[in-house]
């Protein structure tokens, strides 16, 4: 059995275990990565390489910032203000939190946005007396959809643009992706205020013990104006800095500085900071990063795309080709990191489009949007993974509303892309 087939078999088994849900997701992710290393698909170092990477540091640091928001009472204060504005209805809370997430994720890391908003959404839900778990799926998905408003909304957008421009093809300006991204955001809001809301798991499945630990403050401690002010200032600085993050000042480093300031000023103790980190979430991200690497280096991802290309034949219909590119990219991004997905499919599909006299920019736009649609699995994106523990969410909780959203995203995109970028 070659490396590509081995990887696909292991991924299939992992998917089944994700669906069944009897084994913790973090254990499944790490076991899959370790097995791939034992079979020689990836190196032993690859299994743990993500744990020294920026994503893991960013996740851990933002979890600490979120804990500080609760410990200083900032989350409660913000939630109190927002509940007065939105009311205590589920629709009001979804509308408010999703709108903010959509806008912020257009210029900031989706993972950073969810990590920052998670404590506020939890506090709002608890104050309003609505299900915490039902608010987390729309929040997570919004952070993925919102990145389609600008070209810098996601690293995968920037990667796609770079790969296409390296081929000598002029791609998009800063806001041009928003021609499709803005209608998608509107459709997203309408979806979760109507049909999507009904597809969310009924009741509150959230981990009450975890939420109690996550949201508690010191007994009898009142809101501290000084420490609360420091916490808000640090949060705003992190948010602004993320907009201007670059290779010299990456987002994970900025978030780490924020954590150091919060601990140094007493907004959070060292022990509280350590307890704030949800280690199972980090193991899921780390393990799936290794699996994503295996999909790339083994040729498993290319095997899937080659199969699709062979099905299309030598002279496919232009709309059919666009639909296939979108579908394949969207399916892959639920199994691989979105940046890995675009690095795989862009060099394959764009030259084919050029050879078939199909507008390569339209194909690039489809790749950007589809790569930011990880709605089918809890491990498709770091934003999804962040919500697993507090919401006690499983595969079905993501797949059921995510399937409808995937269909909607694809339908809207396939209608609008040929209008703005004729095939």
Specify the residue positions occupied by each region the protein language model found.
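Juxtamembrane and boundary regions of transmembrane helices in multi-pass small-molecule transporters
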Residues: 2, 6, 65, 88, ...
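Membrane-embedded alpha-helical segments and adjacent helix-loop junctions characteristic
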Residues: 13, 34, 38-131, 276-281, ...
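Hydrophobic transmembrane alpha-helices of multi-pass small-molecule transporters
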Residues: 1-60, 64-66, 176-306, 322, ...
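Hydrophobic residues within alpha-helical transmembrane segments
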Residues: 31, 99-100, 138-141, 183, ...
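Helix N-cap/coil-helix junction residues
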Residues: 22-23, 41, 74, 130, ...
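Transmembrane helix boundary and interhelical junction motifs in multipass membrane proteins
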Residues: 24-30, 75, 109-118, 151-158, ...
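Transmembrane alpha-helix interface/packing and boundary motifs in multi-pass membrane proteins
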Residues: 14-23, 100-109, 141-152, 240-246, ...
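Alpha-helix capping and helix-loop boundary segments enriched in small/acidic/polar residues
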Residues: 3-4, 22, 51, 69, ...
């Amino acid at each position: 059995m070659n490396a590509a087939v081995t990887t696909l078999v292991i991924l299939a088994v992992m998917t089944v275990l994700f669906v069944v849900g009897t084994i913790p997701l973090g254990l499944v992710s790490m076991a899959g990565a370790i097995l791939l290393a034992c079979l020689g698909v990836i190196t032993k170092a690859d299994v743990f390489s993500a744990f020294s990477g920026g994503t893991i540091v960013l996740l851990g640091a933002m979890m600490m910032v979120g804990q500080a928001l609760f410990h200083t009472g900032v989350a409660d204060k913000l939630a109190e203000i927002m509940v007065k504005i939105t009311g205590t209805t589920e629709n009001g809370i979804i509308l408010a939190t999703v709108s903010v997430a959509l806008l912020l994720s257009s210029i900031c890391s989706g993972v950073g946005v969810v990590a920052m908003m998670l404590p506020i959404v939890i506090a709002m839900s608890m104050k309003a007396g609505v299900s915490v778990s039902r608010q987390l799926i729309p929040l997570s998905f919004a952070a993925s959809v919102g990145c389609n408003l600008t070209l810098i909304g996601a690293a995968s957008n920037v990667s796609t643009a770079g790969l296409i421009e390296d081929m000598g093809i002029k791609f998009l300006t800063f806001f041009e992706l928003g021609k499709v991204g803005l209608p998608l955001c509107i459709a997203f809001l309408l979806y979760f205020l109507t049909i999507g809301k009904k597809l969310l798991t009924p009741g509150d499945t959230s981990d009450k013990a975890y939420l109690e630990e996550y949201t508690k403050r010191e007994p009898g401690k009142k809101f501290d104006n000084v420490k609360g002010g420091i916490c808000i200032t640090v949060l705003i600085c992190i948010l602004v800095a993320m907009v201007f993050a670059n290779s010299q000042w990456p987002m994970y480093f900025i978030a780490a500085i924020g954590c150091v300031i919060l601990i140094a000023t007493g907004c959070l103790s060292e022990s509280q900071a350590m307890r704030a980190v949800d280690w199972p979430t980090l193991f899921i991200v780390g393990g799936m990063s290794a699996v994503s690497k295996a999909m790339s280096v083994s040729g498993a991802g290319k095997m899937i795309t080659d199969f699709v290309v062979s099905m299309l034949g030598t002279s496919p219909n232009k709309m059919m080709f666009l639909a296939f590119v979108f579908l394949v990219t969207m399916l892959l991004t639920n199994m691989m990191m979105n940046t890995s997905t675009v690095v795989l499919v862009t060099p394959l599909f764009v030259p084919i489009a050029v050879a078939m006299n199909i507008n390569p920019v339209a194909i690039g736009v489809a790749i950007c949007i589809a790569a930011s649609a990880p709605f089918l699995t809890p491990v498709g994106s770091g934003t999804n993974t962040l919500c697993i523990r507090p919401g006690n969410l499983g595969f079905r909780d993501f797949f059921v509303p995510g399937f409808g959203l995937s269909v909607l995203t694809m339908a809207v995109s396939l209608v609008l892309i040929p209008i703005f970028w004729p095939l």
